[in-house]
């Protein structure tokens, strides 16, 4: 407890700042001694830090602020910010101030009359208040606005009437069109409408602010015509026609469009067209819309349930759209035929499904011919530069067969071609297949180069039919894709029988069963896996799996077709389908309840045969 606490408890006045206490003097002298004795200490003591004066914050008691201890105050307390981050003077702004009564006198409100200048039946003149008249309304208003004294000749009651209504400026109208007699005669004549009835319609539109529901309810041309004939002696009565709301709208909007077209305006063409479009009205469409709404509100519970079922079915179809699309593509690929496809690319599959595979094949043939012609020209120029013998053109135009290559004279072949020929003959004798890059193999095969079976097989790999239901690597494709950046890279030696196409796991059993049921039966494995045998085996497995999938798709489509026919028949003949279902149920019950004589005889003969065999 410090001296300040004691003074606070005893309610003593605070010590003046010029007269420090003895304890403070003693503490000051001791602190000075410690400072002089320990001037070389780089870390000041905690007592020295505690003796530092702390800033005083207004708006918070000393005890509450002492709870902070040695902790630093928050930024809001330091900078004097309130709870919303607004700067205030001192710490008192952190707390909600107490309620302070305003020193001004409370305003008085009076129930006072006023005139609305926006009304047509109200006339207001500030210069001559005596002639002000109209519907007097009342509202609550401050009394100070009516503290003026009454003028001479004006009663106190009239002086209290407020003539400046603050909400009169917000009164707006729809801008109903008006016309003159000349405009009506020149542009607005109609055989179905008289001028008097048209004027009556425009008056109602102005009175009810184009609210056609109210206008149609208040429309009574028979009574209006009677009053008009009573006031005029030369008018001839006309037959009164029944007018619907659509008839009133058609007449009003037609008048507006004709007036817009006939009147001179400074607006451009686009503005006038937009203005005309705002007054467009289609009577037939409006009638059909109202009929549709009436039918919508008169639906039965059965129709509502059917509509809900249709909505659920549509949502289900939308959710399964991706699945149906994939099944459709698969079915088109099956119907298009896998044998007619030149390659397994997505474009070729789509072309086969849409029936344009022939066009795609023609384009590929023309492209291949163009590549072959350019390759022949390059090879001819290269041979002329090497040997100066243009006779090598015959070798470049060959089909690439080995027998044709051996029949050529060796004088027309270069050293590179002779080496390729010897290598091709050796590979053919030893049944060796060498895979080259796809680009080089395709170019050499199309150009007729002598690369042997390797080039032929590599080139034919791009024209192999796709096997949609086989997995693995085809025998005509390398096990590892060659890298064009590194032509010398390749794969190791492997057995051809270890890399063959196989059916999918879900088709293995059915494929094996179909092969065993064939004539002659075919085993599940290939005995002599040569290159030709492997290729034929893959063709056979691909045909079997494709046929199985096609049969599965056919059964599914037939089942869906049968269900659709049953639904159509049930929708067209509901009573007949109910009779058939009842008849079939009765037949099943009769067969299960009472066996026929034939079944009893058959059962008896069966028992007799079993008895004879056992004896």
Swiss-Prot record:
Main location: nucleus
Residue ranges constituting the SANT domain according to the UniProt record: 185-256
Gene Ontology process terms (BP): chromatin remodeling; DNA repair; negative regulation of transcription by RNA polymerase II
InterPro entries for the chain: DAMP1_SANT-like, Swc4/Dmap1
Segments for region (Disordered): 1-56, 367-418, 575-615
Biased composition (Polar residues): 595-615
Biased composition regions of type Low complexity, renumbered to the chain: 16-52, 391-407, 584-594
Family stated for the protein in its record: Belongs to the SWC4 family.
Quaternary context: Component of the SWR1 chromatin-remodeling complex and of the NuA4 histone acetyltransferase complex.
Free-text function comment from the UniProt entry: Component of the SWR1 complex which mediates the ATP-dependent exchange of histone H2A for the H2A variant HZT1 leading to transcriptional regulation of selected genes by chromatin remodeling. Component of the NuA4 histone acetyltransferase complex which is involved in transcriptional activation of selected genes principally by acetylation of nucleosomal histone H4 and H2A. The NuA4 complex is also involved in DNA repair.
Protein name: SWR1-complex protein 4
Organism: Mycosarcoma maydis (Corn smut fungus)
Lineage start: Eukaryota, Fungi, Dikarya, Basidiomycota, Ustilaginomycotina
Gene: SWC4
């Amino acid at each position: 407890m410090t001296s300040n606490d004691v003074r606070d408890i005893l309610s003593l006045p605070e010590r003046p700042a010029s007269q420090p206490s003895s304890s403070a003097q003693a503490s000051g002298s001791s602190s000075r001694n410690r400072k002089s004795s320990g001037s070389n200490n780089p870390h000041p003591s905690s007592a020295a830090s505690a003796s530092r004066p702390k800033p005083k914050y207004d708006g918070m008691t000393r005890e509450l602020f002492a709870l902070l201890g040695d902790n630093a105050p928050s930024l809001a307390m330091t900078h004097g910010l309130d709870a919303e981050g607004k700067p205030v003077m001192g710490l008192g702004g952190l707390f909600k101030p107490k309620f302070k009564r305003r020193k001004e006198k409370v305003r008085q409100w009076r129930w006072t009359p006023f005139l609305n200048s926006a009304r047509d039946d109200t006339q207001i003149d500030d210069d001559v208040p005596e002639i002000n008249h109209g519907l007097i309304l009342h509202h609550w208003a401050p009394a100070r606005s009516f503290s003026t004294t009454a003028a001479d000749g004006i009663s106190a009651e009239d002086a209290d009437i407020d003539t400046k209504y603050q909400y009169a400026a917000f009164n707006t109208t729809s801008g109903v069109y008006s016309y003159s007699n000349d405009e009506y005669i020149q542009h607005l004549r109609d055989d179905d409408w008289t001028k008097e009835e048209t004027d009556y319609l425009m008056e109602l539109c102005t009175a009810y602010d184009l609210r056609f529901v109210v206008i149609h309810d208040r429309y009574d041309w028979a009574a209006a015509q009677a009053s008009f004939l009573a006031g005029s002696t030369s008018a001839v009565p006309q037959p009164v026609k029944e007018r619907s709301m659509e008839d009133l709208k058609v007449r009003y909007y037609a008048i507006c469009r004709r007036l817009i077209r006939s009147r001179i305006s400074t607006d451009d063409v686009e503005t006038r067209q937009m203005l005309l479009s705002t007054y467009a009205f289609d009577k037939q469409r409006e009638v059909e819309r109202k009929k549709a709404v009436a039918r919508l509100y008169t639906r039965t519970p059965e129709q509502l349930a059917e509509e809900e079922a249709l909505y659920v079915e549509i949502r289900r179809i939308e959710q399964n759209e991706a699945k149906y699309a994939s099944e459709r593509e698969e079915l088109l690929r099956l119907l298009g035929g896998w044998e007619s496809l030149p390659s397994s690319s997505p474009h070729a599959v789509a072309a086969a499904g849409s029936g344009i595979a022939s066009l795609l094949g023609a384009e590929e043939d023309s492209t291949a011919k163009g590549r072959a012609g350019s390759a022949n020209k390059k090879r001819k120029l290269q041979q002329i530069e090497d040997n100066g013998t243009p006779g090598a053109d015959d070798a470049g135009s060959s089909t690439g067969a080995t027998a044709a290559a051996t029949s050529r004279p060796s004088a027309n072949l270069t050293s590179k071609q002779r080496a390729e020929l010897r290598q091709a003959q050796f590979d053919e004798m030893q049944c060796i297949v060498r895979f080259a890059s796809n680009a080089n193999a395709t170019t050499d095969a199309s150009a007729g180069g002598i690369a042997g079976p390797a080039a032929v097989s590599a080139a034919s790999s791009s024209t192999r039919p796709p096997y949609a239901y086989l997995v693995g690597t085809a025998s005509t494709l390398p096990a590892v894709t060659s890298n064009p950046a590194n032509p010398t890279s390749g794969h190791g030696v492997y057995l051809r029988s270890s890399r063959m196409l196989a059916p999918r796991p879900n088709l293995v059993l059915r494929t094996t069963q179909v092969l065993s049921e064939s004539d002659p039966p075919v085993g599940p494995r290939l005995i002599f896996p040569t290159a030709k045998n492997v290729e034929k085996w893959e063709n056979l497995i691909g045909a079997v799996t494709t046929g199985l999938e096609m049969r599965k798709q056919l059964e599914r489509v037939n089942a869906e077709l049968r269900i659709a026919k049953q639904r159509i028949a049930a929708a067209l003949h509901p009573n007949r389908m109910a009779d058939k279902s009842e008849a079939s149920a009765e037949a099943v019950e009769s067969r299960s309840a009472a066996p026929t004589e034939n079944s009893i005889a058959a059962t008896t003969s069966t028992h007799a045969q079993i008895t004879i065999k056992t004896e």
